[in-house]
Amino acid sequence: MSNTDTIVAQATPPGRGGVGILRVSGQAAAEVAHAVLGKLPKPRHADYLPFRDTNGTTLDQGIALWFPGPNSFTGEDVLELQGHGGPVILDLLLQRILTLPNVRIARPGEFSERAFLNDKLDLAQAEAIADLIDASSEQAARSALNSLQGVFSTRINQLVEALTHLRIYVEAAIDFPDEEIDFLSDGKIEAQLNGVMADLDAVRTEAHQGSLLREGMKVVIAGRPNAGKSSLLNALAGREAAIVTAIAGTTRDVLREHIHIDGMPLHIIDTAGLRDASDEVERIGIERAWQEIEQADRVLFMVDGTTTQATEPEQIWPEFMARLPKTLPITVVRNKADVTGETLGIADVNTHSLIRLSARTGEGVDTLRDHLKQSMGFTSNTEGGFLARRRHLQALELAAQHLIQGKEQLVSAYAGELLAEELRLAQQSLSEITGEFTSDDLLGRIFSSFCIGK
């Protein structure tokens, strides 16, 4: 498919609605306007007109908006037709437009892709459009809007600019080795490099917060049957999401709930009680439980406080701990504090946290919520923050590693050429975030995840 084609797509969700919008972008957008409207509307003014088919019969009537390029979202000529939101009407109008030469249905995300290719927005801003649409909380929406408005891109561009100045200084020192002053050892380059590294660390911290807002944390509640796992799921969710009975093994399959803690998405997964099961259905549920455990960001190891005084997970259930991935963080949750009389609260026990609560009464559950938020390093103050994706975090991490390696070359050997190369690679990693340096394959993956009309 050619980027010189004119594209059309429905910009509103499929199905019935009060308003349905078709968006057209490309060189033939003016021809579409003349064919469907009989005229070219005044730029950036709403014009109430009939929408006609090939025979001149009115299909619908509504508002037409004309945005001549380059002053449009895509940078191309753009026509928007806002009619009634009936699927039949919109389909008839769409088919009418597709009868015109060099007009085709847009690929997913192609409008945003053209905006990126025409320098109307960078790659991080383009991704922010999809993130704003998908935002699951007010904080996530605000942060996505900040990214769309260029907050994240500005921070990245400032880092790239600082690296450019540093590279110029380093390469000047390489090109003029006979100068009386040894620029590589006078401390100025190292001081500038330390400043860039500190700024990069600050951006990485903000990006981590943005990633948590976008993707959240996957928490699996695991333990023996009747430990109170489903009761805890209900307490965290604030509703009766899971059936709770005194019968061991009530939960036989994975249950999922999505909640927010101060804006951070939390994906809570309740699992079947872990034990040796003879029942085939329960056995399958237990295997699924282990699959979820192995993919979790954190495991809440649920313990019935009436059955043991132990607080060390290895003492409570050594077989469970032996199978658990060694790098997986766990929090031991001693349940039924309302029965045992244990003091509610949180404590650190060797390498893990221990929380005493009552899932039935809800006492101590707020402490668990705060613990989950803090364990991911999430802060609820997102004023001026931005949303970030995993690829952004990876690019920032790679840039940081290149700067660390570059500093080692500078401090240990005053190796200017090697430092310059590490600075270049760090700059390249950062440029991948905004799309200044990005492969076509990556662009394809990013924009294919967008809505058709975006």
Curated annotation (Swiss-Prot):
Exhibits a very high intrinsic GTPase hydrolysis rate. Involved in the addition of a carboxymethylaminomethyl (cmnm) group at the wobble position (U34) of certain tRNAs, forming tRNA-cmnm(5)s(2)U34. It comes from Pectobacterium atrosepticum (strain SCRI 1043 / ATCC BAA-672). This is tRNA modification GTPase MnmE. Its EC number is 3.6.-.-. It comes from the Bacteria. NCBIfam families: mnmE_trmE_thdF, PRK05291.1-3, small_GTP. K(+) binds at N226, T245, I247, T250. It is found in: Cytoplasm. GO terms for biological process: tRNA methylation; tRNA wobble uridine modification. The gene is mnmE. Mg(2+) binds at S230, T251. Pfam families: MMR_HSR1, MnmE_helical, TrmE_N. Homodimer. Heterotetramer of two MnmE and two MnmG subunits. Its cofactor is K(+). InterPro entries: G_TrmE, GTP-bd, GTP-bd_TrmE_N, GTPase_MnmE, MnmE_dom2, MnmE_helical, P-loop_NTPase, Small_GTP-bd. Binds 1 potassium ion per subunit. Keywords: Cytoplasm, GTP-binding, Hydrolase, Magnesium, Metal-binding, Nucleotide-binding, Potassium, tRNA processing. Belongs to the TRAFAC class TrmE-Era-EngA-EngB-Septin-like GTPase superfamily. TrmE GTPase family. GTP binds at residues 226-231, 245-251, 270-273, 335-338, 358-360. The lineage of its organism: Bacteria, Pseudomonadati, Pseudomonadota, Gammaproteobacteria, Enterobacterales.
